[in-house]
Amino acid sequence: MIENPNEVVTKALVRLVAVPGLDSKAALITLDNGLDYKKPNSFGPAGLRSLDEAITTATAADPAFIALTGKPYIFCVGADITGMPLITDRAQAVELGELGHRVFARLKDSAVPTFAFINGAALGSGLEVALHCHYRTVSTGAAALGLPEVAIGLIPGWGGSQLLPNLIGAPGAAQVILQNPLTQKVLKPKQAAEMGVADVLFEPADFLERSLEWAAGVVKGEITVERPEIDRDMWDGVLFFARQQLDEKLHGAVPSANKALELLALAKDASFADGTAAETEALADLIMGDESRASLYAFDLVQRRAKRPVGVPDKSLARKVTKVGIVGAGLMASQLALLFARRLEVPVVLTDLDQARVDKGVEYVHGQVDKMVSRGRMDEGTAAKLRGLVSGSVDKSVFADADFVIEAVFENLDVKKQVWAEIEKIVSPDAVLATNTSSLSVTAMAADLDHPERVVGFHFFNPVAVLPLLEIVKGERTDDATLATAFAVGKELKKSCVLVK
């Protein structure tokens, strides 16, 4: 039996509630981990088993209906991901997927009506369990609703990829499952109602009372819930367009997005059993893959450390950056060029070994800018300015007046040391030399330089435009001014910066 020793168990507590107008009582299941809103409800193995027991208890009471709600401000914010890194073999991952499916399906297959009273944030498996219920009320005070799993290298693995598109259609499902996570967006209650995720909205002050009354009206046949008609003729076209967008933006760098897209396509014609079986297999693949493990690591850093970074020097020590140099002109370097130019609004110059590579890198940036204009995300005046900020050369002397130079070359220590040996002779003594290395020693990289104190790790996660984490790595001789500058630049780039030593 799969267990998570770190799980903060969200218990499912059952009480029978008298509802005016009904002969039988309603069974109200409340999700509550016993802590305040700062530690939200989540589903780990023990939490799922608690919900399973609660559904059994509720069903045995022969209620008029079963309703699921959460503790104050929080419905449920998803799976307890603290246990994911502890899964060591695929069989455990499959077991976790099947457990969630089995428990949630009991709400979908219930002989009595089931309702989700979404009183607060409902994310990930929190929204998935609500989708298994026959009806959903949502508080106008709910902070967020969504399926953000793709952003952390996973998929909606407990029915979301199959239920949502068949509830609101392929366009809305693609937005919630793919587009929103990759742009760090969620649904607000009004939008959830407009899309058909929520059947009705109520104000927070009397949310539970109004939800119970509304549910009674549904049970008695006094209230009819109309659902949007699903246009299956446009399903394939919507997903074809979504795949094009993913390929253009991510270049295959996010396997979870491709898995989610495949599951959305399957949801058009597959039975629910076949669809959820495919979900389990996809979830297991991703849990055991490098992408989800790296993404979960990054997510943990952002949640625990980026919000309260420790060891960051006084920001007054940071030097002003008026020009950025990038060594390399490949895909990563080109993504960095676009990010620096867009956020810092300073000249950015790329270099590489030959002009063809340089030209390709600059063309990539210009092409991305053109796409933003065509999609209405940028006006032509801003685009023209941005294009003018990015240039390239095979001559590294263009770095002479750069305040911040970052390398994105081959992941080899000798290669990177050679790069810095060349660059150090060109730039000013206090220019920051940043490395995007993911695994090499910053200290070793700087060891032979005249000014090792201005070398710092500046590690982005790919794709650069999507993932918020930025690891700033302090070498043994990195000084406070360099470190402060790195954090200041990271903040301007709108990244969540964490200090790594």
Q: What do the PLM-derived regions correspond to, one by one?
A:
Residues 161-174:
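Hydrophobic, secondary-structure "cap" segments at the distal end of domains
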Residues 1-30, 128, 173-282, 293, ...:
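Amphipathic alpha-helical segments at domain termini/boundaries
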Residues 21, 307-368, 391, 475, ...:
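NAD(P)+-binding Rossmann beta1-loop-alpha1 motif at the extreme N-terminus of oxidoreductases
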Residues 101, 106-152, 156, 328-331:
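Glycine-rich beta-to-alpha active-site loop
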Residues 38, 69-103, 122, 151-154:
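Glycine- (often His-adjacent) and acidic-residue-rich active-site loop
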Residues 1-69, 105:
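Conserved CoA-thioester-binding segment of acyl-CoA-metabolizing enzymes
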Residues 417-488:
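Rossmann-fold NAD(P)-binding glycine/threonine-rich loop
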Residues 82, 322, 351-432:
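NAD(P)H/NAD(P)+-dependent Rossmann-fold oxidoreductase cores
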